[in-house]
Amino acid sequence: MKVRASVKKICRNCKIIKRSGVVRVICVEPKHKQRQG
């Protein structure tokens, strides 16, 4: 899980979702998981 100021899709499997007010990226590749902080 990376905490970033700006979350971006890294590959085509990445999806940007908003979970309880927090922007997240979920992906099949665990390295691509991100959270806005």
Curated annotation (Swiss-Prot):
Taxonomy, superkingdom: Bacteria
InterPro entries: Ribosomal_bL36, Ribosomal_bL36_sp
SUPFAM superfamilies given in the database record: Ribosomal protein L36 (SSF57840)
Gene Ontology MF annotations: structural constituent of ribosome
Gene Ontology process terms (BP): translation
Keyword Ribosomal protein on entry: yes
Keyword list, A-Z: Ribonucleoprotein, Ribosomal protein
Disulfide bonds: none
GO cellular component: cytoplasm; ribonucleoprotein complex; ribosome
Family according to the record: Belongs to the bacterial ribosomal protein bL36 family.
PANTHER family recorded: 50S RIBOSOMAL PROTEIN L36, CHLOROPLASTIC, LARGE RIBOSOMAL SUBUNIT PROTEIN BL36C
NCBIfam families with a match to the protein in the record: rpmJ_bact
Protein name: Large ribosomal subunit protein bL36
